[in-house]
Amino acid sequence: MTATAPRSDPATSIAMTTADFGRIARSVQDEFGIFLPEAKKDLVYSRLLKRVRALGLPDFAAYCNLVESPAGAGERTEMLSALTTNVTHFFREMHHFDLLRDKVLPPLLHAARKGARVRLWSAGCSSGQEPYSLAFTVLSLLPEAARHDIRILATDVDPQVIDRARNGIYAAADRDTIPAPMLSQFTDKTPDGLRIGDAARALISFAPLNLMGDWPMRGAFDVIFCRNVAIYFDAPTQERLWQRFAGLMRPGAHLLIGHSERIAGPAEASLENVGITAYRLAGQAPEKPNQTKAERAIA
């Protein structure tokens, strides 16, 4: 018997008990690091009820059995898509892109012209507006960027949004947040909105990646954007994430985080605040974790 009455749908008599919610919350946190407090129970119920119905399951207990099973990997991804909201736009938190344009990118691109390797990472890229904004900023400073060793990695835990991001097709409303010169130079107008141009596409590699899992990247990053992602994690998970980022950054590299996020834990000692939610790796670069042969093969 549960401590509180189960949340239920009168039309179908499908209820979600406190025990069901606890199982779902554990699955989401174990798999994706996302913390679901009790206050989110109604939201979880309303969003996952659609999945229970679509699968023809009798109740949430059966749904929990599915997502907890080895055969439920695909449904765990569907569950994540149902529970997360991908709200973003081009050049969100413009001050970060101003910092890139004015201070961070000029020395990096100068080095790239001389043969240096430059790597940027949009971690939790959602539907792609962030990495494309990075590409536009790079191209505005170095139009021939694709001829140099400059690459942007864009990852998200949700394969469905990665597919949308890779497609690079956006609605007319998305035009409003792109500076006019960049809009004309780096996008193509379509009847319903815009298409990302080839110059920006050439700089970006999209890939699904769970930040709670292994990171099969080699080499160090010069810039990491991970904004409005860590807010879904509990404090210990956030601290581990900041430390892992620091371990993949070059000395002097920058980490940009969301407006409601703060660096805490061991990474505080090596990440110096240099602006609004902007941090620079100070001192010597942390040693990189050991990599497998397969990991070393991924650029």
Mark where each language-model region is.
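Conserved AdoMet
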Residues: 2-121
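Residue-level signal for inorganic ion chemistry
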Residues: 100, 224, 249
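A structural alpha-helix within SAM-dependent methyltransferase catalytic domains
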Residues: 101, 135-139, 246
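Extended basic-aromatic, gly/pro-enriched interface segments that bind polyanionic ligands
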Residues: 123, 144-225, 229-240, 262-264, ...
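Conserved SAM-binding loop of SAM-dependent methyltransferases across substrates and taxa
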Residues: 127-145
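A short glycine-rich, Lys/Arg-flanked "PGG" loop and its adjoining helix->strand segment in the class I
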Residues: 239-251
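Conserved beta-strand signature within the Rossmann-like core of class I S-adenosyl-L-methionine
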Residues: 252-259
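Core SAM-dependent methyltransferase catalytic element
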Residues: 264-299
